[in-house]
Amino acid sequence: MGANSSTIKELSENEFLKKLSGTDSISENEPFWNQLLSFSFSTPTNSADSKLLEEGTLSICKSLIENNPRTGNLGALIRVFLSRTKELKISAECQNQLFIWQAHNALFIICRLIKVFTSQISEEELLLHFTYRPADPGNYESDTENLFEELLFCLIQLIVEIPLLDLTYSILLEAVTALIVLLSYQLFRKDILHESPIHRHLMKGPCLPYTSRLVKTLLYNFIRQEKSPPPGSHIFPQQQDGGGLLYGLASGVASGIWTVLTLGGVGSKPTPQQEQSSPLANQSLLLLLVLSNLTDAPDCPNPFRQSVTFFRNTQDSSVSPTPNPHSFQINFNSLYTALCEQQKSDQATLLLYTLLHQNSNVRTYVLARSDMENLVLPILEILYHVEDRNSHHVYMALIILLILTEDDGFNRSIHEVILKNITWYTERVLTEISLGSLLILVVIRTIQYNMTRTRDKYLHTNCLAALANMSAQFRSLHQYAAQRIISLFSLLSKKHNKVLEQATQSLRGSLGSDESPLPDYAQDLNVIEEVIRMMLEIINSCLTNSLHHNPNMVYALLYKRELFEQFRSHPSFQDIMQNIDMVISFFSLRLEQAGADLSVERVLEVIKQGAVALPKDRLRKFPELKFKYVEEEQPEEFFIPYAWSLVYHSGVGLYWNPQDIQLFTMDSG
């Protein structure tokens, strides 16, 4: 990007910025504003450039914080911006770039000033800065004008009403960024903000009727994934005839004052990363996640969450029995396609989770798709590369699978989808496998990874719950999937024996010893036995419900039959072992009768014949395994820090000093 730190530092001495932050009041009608706002450069697109820019202008911002109570210059700048935006929609339609250019520049400065304000002063003090007027020190305006609310309303209006074109891309991105910055006080608090003046302004008053339009626009920005136009697309172009007086003034200022800002460089070649990026889509998604996770006000449920919860498909003509004022309609096919294509990012996975969990219309639509593999495969790839992902991303992917496996139709259909050559699955060549078998392989691999590395009980529980939900519908399991189920049981069995041995030795060693407390092996044993019980229930569910569909499962069971002997008489497993024991005995006898040295093909043939002959009434019926995902109490304690960690790590052109962050630790995102 080529940000030049030496020239960035010159900004602190820039005469226009010094005047803005100085001790003299500037009227909204002065030519100063045309001079200040006539600069040309590309907005920073990464945190490194933003850090340089913030460091270069920090002294200016601090001066404004000190002098604004007497000058009211922040309010004057905002009023200038508001006046420039009045003609924006017409300017966009008429390709009038001057208004858009100056409005963008005004908003860019406002956003950078407020960004520093939020890290230096409280939310209440910030709102007070919007009220200061020139004249007497500390003099502020009457209640008839709420400048902060006007700015908030203007930003939302701008996002929802200005068409997305090359020349409006930058100002739309800046408006979305400005809303994120205004909400960023949460970053500097360890506790979750339940009461916030800024939140109240968003959820009530003139902003409230725009809730559904804002959510819809942010979603469409995500769906469209519009690439950033070449740097300088929003800038007033050089005219061959020299242009008019206004252009001449703007051009002179741009070349003489602001060329120190070489972030990206106007007209410089974008890097391949820039060419591929869709900053507006990314920033819109981050804002949507932040808004939808705001806590409810005491007298007002979060309207953004309501909007996310109740929106419907454009092709849905039915009348909702309980219409919500913040609902809207959007093209679900386009949304589904975008969700499938973008799952490599945490924020897209969090959006998918949010929609599947909260919006029953989206969940019903997704489960009815005939191309479910387009959504499931990216989720499985996230889990397969578990070591490269943060724990939150893995959790979201797992919970998405758990939600999907709550549906019997999903559990049946995934075994009918045949995949060829899954290139990212490198442990074994899978030339042909069903989506269901691949799902089983990846979930089991995740459990095994967790057993050896993180040892997270919560992760185990979700993995096993997904397998349990699927187990009654297992169909034509791939031989490798069947082997891995039994291999996992083998691993658990060895772990059980090891813990049992440690507990026995510990007990012997503690006799006659008065030393410090020993490890709680009883608790370890209890946990491992819970997991073993769950695995036995999954195997049992497959055998009792779909044995005749799964010869490979019976084959794997018989091949490792000795694993199950030690659990036959164990009081925790006796009941569930009855069916497994009976199946092993039944098929072992038939194989003995078939003769010695049987080929794999012949063994499978005997199993298939035996499956038809096995009396179903000999298998004891157990309750169907059904697990449902339930969000924990106070979900905001997890989701608000997670959403903001994504803003911190993935926000376009946003930098916060890591030492100022209180909401989460740097390794949690």
UniProtKB/Swiss-Prot annotation:
GO CC entries: Golgi apparatus
Major location (coarse): cytoplasm
Lipid addition sites, N-myristoyl glycine: G2
Protein modification: Myristoylated in vitro; myristoylation is not essential for protein targeting to Golgi compartment.
InterPro entries: Dymeclin (IPR019142)
Compartment(s): Cytoplasm; Golgi apparatus
Keyword list, A-Z: Cytoplasm, Golgi apparatus, Lipoprotein, Myristate
Chain's role: Necessary for correct organization of Golgi apparatus.
Family recorded in the similarity comment: Belongs to the dymeclin family.
Protein name as annotated: Dymeclin
